[in-house]
Amino acid sequence: RQRQMCIRDRAYGRECCMRGLKTYYIKATELRDRFQKAVQRGNTSRVVSSLVKPSCLIVDEVGRCVCDRPCTDLFFDVVDRRYEKEGPNAMVLTSNIAPSGWDEFFTGDDTLLCALDRLFDKASVFVMRGPSYRGRGLDTYSVEAVPQAVKVRGIQPEGM
């Protein structure tokens, strides 16, 4: 299944692939859903391992969904295991929300802080500001409503 990625995610992921690195892309909502299903089915270790395995893990739209305590714990497990992993272990997290605001979306005492500590230990942080590029090529039209139907050349509109 092909995934739509933001330009920055696609560029980084593509570069990783060009260098022979296994790359996996997932939206934060999909990640939360995978974690919830794993908890229900009792296969959390398998799901966490599958997210630790790729050389590059891209999680898009962090902070667009609320994660309960088990999901937050699993997110930490992924971050922790990737942090300790030998070899390439890049993680790309994209968000329109600053990491200082992520605590509204992750549940748990210091679990998120521990994950962020590991994420930012060796991180390169890119802050991008400015207008969105989405929708720049849109055609826009102005439509004006006519307050009342009028009779034109002897033709009467329906309902009059």
Residue ranges: model-predicted function:
Residues 1, 26-30:
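Short, surface-exposed recognition loops or helix-turn segments adjacent to catalytic cores
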Residues 13-26:
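Post-Walker A helix-loop "phosphate-sensing" segment adjacent to the P-loop in P-loop NTPases
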Residues 8, 12:
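Hydrophobic positions on the alpha1 helix immediately C-terminal to the Walker A/P-loop
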Residues 2-7:
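Short, small-residue-biased leader/transition segments that mark boundaries at the very start
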